[in-house]
């Protein structure tokens, strides 16, 4: 199906696709304009392998309008499982899970009629999004299973690695009552948002078995259904919904926003449920009719086609409204077209409080794709047409600080290549000078980071450059490099982002792509987090985050000028974030050298907020005037007295 043929299909602008439940009746609606007939098959269970599995009958849907087939069944069909059977004019048939399914049985093979009110945890009606000002925002990325799977996490065994692992608020290491873990730890770290790697239903983990495997989840199956392997009961579809909401509510009670990692750039299979409902419509193709694979791991969704765009917007709104999600991170955002991303931003903005919902993504692709109809990819080159409240991950900041992620031994500013100071200077002001050919209009568009789930952890990267092989040793040189790296991006303008455990030297022992596990490699090591040397690193992160929150001009969130850069010798960097309040002036210095370095100070009396090892909002140490000595491999922040 080419672009013209796709655009000739009827567009449905309703908001009622899917199974719409009331105790008196359920209405099924499916957009399938090329089908000749559609039947809904009803089942007692999500799979035929479960006790009491049996077929409850089949019912024909009727053609309604604009490509939609519809059926209203009287009676209470709550928790009934269903599947669509489609017949096409050329004789082909297909079985498909409802693309608008709200929940499903084990492994997502059948959708389930859901009573959303009955699938609400206690107190859900009172759940509110935390209000977090732009300058105080920071993101901590974690996989649901990684968060609490550690046997030492203090989380009850039945909740470990599950949505419910986020709910207990008082967990400690082995229950010792002293060393906080999981949510109890997060409450005091100082980050504002938790970004969850994919929590929608994905393909490659067998939900029916406790040992069904591990995956990061970038293999989407049912976009509006929570992943069943994170539920304590994957066989009853209402459980995953209730427990996912309970997780969000627990994070909100702790004052934390929830960002959802979404994968609307591709489907895992070429015969996805979407493709089965309207063959040839949903995915991009080359002129030879082969599906494009710009993600490198699936079949690209054609976001520029009208009903694909609608589907993505509808899905985002569903998660925002039904699960109170506070932000969305788009995997391979450059595989979406810019108009679709702007439509998402506009739709979120129209929600109550929606302008505070974060929206950002990866401004790159994993291969070649084939945009149609003049669509532009949502990459850095499209910043002139993208909303300035759609952010993007800045790989230039990342690589300048620690070295190129695709070359394990390549060094950056903090670990042996201080000449990258030129790029670090641009990072400070969020690259708004167009130095690399892209022009952010606001600092808040730039996600400043040095590690994420992809590639080596920060600790492992520093170890690789330094040719260390003992990833568990609290190497003093690596700790200093880690602190400087964090000190840089946490004093850059933009939105700071970190991988969970970066703040305690998280290691995967050199595994740069642990997407299939094992869990032992990926899970957070809460014992390591409380080893004294790594706990001190965490304390440094906590202090730097506090400095950032209290010195709003460092963040430069929206409408802020770029910092005033000081002229210093060699590869030293110093700058002053502009402040209208003379009582709220700080100066920041980076020293990548392995020796002490003297610097001249701006006029005034200054005291330290950080000396490169300790950090916090209370000034400490002597008063400095005229000049001071910077410690080796360090970040120094001074406040004007």
Region spans (language model):
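Glycan-recognition and catalytic regions of carbohydrate-active enzymes
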Residues: 11-15, 494-511, 521-523, 527-586
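C-terminal beta-strand-rich structural cap/linker in extracellular carbohydrate-active enzymes
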Residues: 32, 79-82, 621-641
